[in-house]
């Protein structure tokens, strides 16, 4: 995924929430995405852990 992509994010105890990627940072353990959400318009960071399906919080919107 890249900046300006529309995504959904997994949050605790609720449905996936729509957002837009503001920044991307790659790490050896996975990728951090700064995502703008309705109640966090300046963005909040989410981490997608490489190699662990349970550690995927950001997915590209369909």
UniProtKB/Swiss-Prot annotation:
InterPro entries: Dextransucrase_DSRB. It comes from Escherichia coli (strain K12). NCBIfam families: PRK10708.1. Coiled coil: none annotated. It comes from the Bacteria. Induction: Expression is dependent on RpoS. Belongs to the DsrB family. Pfam families: DSRB. This is Protein DsrB.
